[in-house]
């Protein structure tokens, strides 16, 4: 059966996703950056309160995936901490200046990771040649690849996703479709033979604050609503899981 991983930007979201039936959590912070390494406090709380597998992302900054020596040292230190805390896996990815998998650094990462299941994240979508990258990641014994098929969303990348699944032939990394995977389009990925789906399944949640200071923001983008935040929608996760488990019909509306 196809597995459902939910991207969570807080422990609250992870708890909602678990209760709704998610198979696994990718734990992040920094939604506006596309996902950054969660804090030590978030990692500790997740270990204490979430029972399904949690795979924290290790990404020290936003932007590209070609890292300085300091960035890379931070990545290895964070992975070692995640390993020692007993997490099931980790999500990471490193490229070189030419848009290829940085094999030297990835070998170091695999060594530090130990028994952690390593997901190579959407840095894969920034690679020059996805088929060469697939073989390199297979050689590294990476557990899975999170990818949109090198497109802005996974539905647009469905052709490459199918090619990647065919190339693995049930061997090597699991191909996990992510970016724009929703209840209304997930059947397309299931029909393509994709074994794992990654979704944020989220909604905007209004702040509980009654007093709201006007004219002051904590973000450089003054248009951002700071009295709202993004969180997992448990009902959506339940519906997605229901489709996977029972083959429930898709809703007619988008």
Curated annotation (Swiss-Prot):
Where is the protein found, in the record's own terms? Cytoplasm
Q: Which GO terms describe its molecular function?
A: copper ion binding
Q: Looking at the keywords, is Cytoplasm present?
A: yes
Q: Does the keyword Cytoplasm apply?
A: yes
Concerning Pfam families, the annotation shows:
CutC
Q: Name one GO cellular component term.
A: cytoplasm
Using the UniProt record, give the first listed, main subcellular location. Answer: cytoplasm
Q: Which Gene3D superfamilies match?
A: Copper homeostasis (CutC) domain
InterPro entries named in the record: CutC-like, CutC-like_dom_sf
Record's keyword terms, sorted? Cytoplasm
For this chain, the family text in UniProt reads: Belongs to the CutC family.
Q: What is this protein called?
A: PF03932 family protein CutC
From which organism does this entry originate?
A: Yersinia enterocolitica serotype O:8 / biotype 1B (strain NCTC 13174 / 8081)
